[in-house]
């Protein structure tokens, strides 16, 4: 595998991460209209006359997104040519580019015509799918060259249930978090983990949005913890699964801590961006576990108290 392709794939993955964080920055700083109702230009000008912080943030996000789109397109073409024989290459290439274009169109439509908060909450999730596809494509590039090549795996039905269920549910959690941001409900509840110390239940829309996200987040934390315990009991001999869940648990706990700190610090910008960063990384790890699950054969359920048998090493094909 060409070394240049590895470097380019890694750089493209980082660029996509900047797109995600940049989008969160635009939302957190309320810079979505920094360029007015003009797209792709700012206020209909190549070089705007009145430079404001919101304009700089919005324009920078557009430039980074445009550059990332070009890089993703090049990566798709190169990976298609070099490793088109790998069955996941073409679907991942299509997903990465199509969803990146889709999120750009939604962003442009929001600027020019405006969109509801419920539609705009999809924006981050769509970008997240594109990021995950690029990340998996990058990992495949290294795997094909027999680096980062995991052992051949056998997953029982319970582990498959955790992998499939958690990644689908995590997307719901991402949507509720994005809805919190777009409805300006981040500080609707001044207390944590309850909405207010004086009462148990929310009483108005923004509080329900905030508490709905907290409840969804609590469920995924517990679910990932359960999956991690299962991996620790039966998959220690398969490090890619065992450590994948350990990392997922650490990331979701970091997500919980930064979520609480967002409330306690009253929307500190750096903590808010860290919150977006951790969920992006978590979704990436879960996506890799999904890829592994789709590639592996099923094995009989593990008997209680027994560990998974060692399996022979084999490169992914």
Swiss-Prot record:
Keywords of this entry: Cell membrane, Disulfide bond, Heme biosynthesis, Iron, Membrane, Metal-binding, Oxidoreductase, Transmembrane, Transmembrane helix
Entry-linked InterPro entries: COX15/CtaA_fam, COX15/CtaA_HemeA_synthase, HemeA_Synthase_type1
Spans traversing the lipid bilayer: 7-27, 55-75, 92-112, 124-144, 160-180, 215-235, 244-264, 273-293
Location of the active site: 58
Bilayer disposition of the protein: Multi-pass membrane protein
Predominant cellular place of this UniProt entry's protein: membrane
Cellular compartments per GO CC: plasma membrane
UniProt KW Zinc keyword: no
Family: Belongs to the COX15/CtaA family. Type 1 subfamily.
Comment, domains: The N-half (TM1-TM4) and C-half (TM5-TM8) domains are connected by an intracellular loop. Each domain is formed from four-helix bundles and they align in a pseudo twofold symmetry manner. The N-half domain is the substrate-heme O binding domain and the C-half domain is the cofactor heme B binding domain.
Name this polypeptide is given: Heme A synthase
Source organism per UniProt: Geobacillus thermodenitrificans
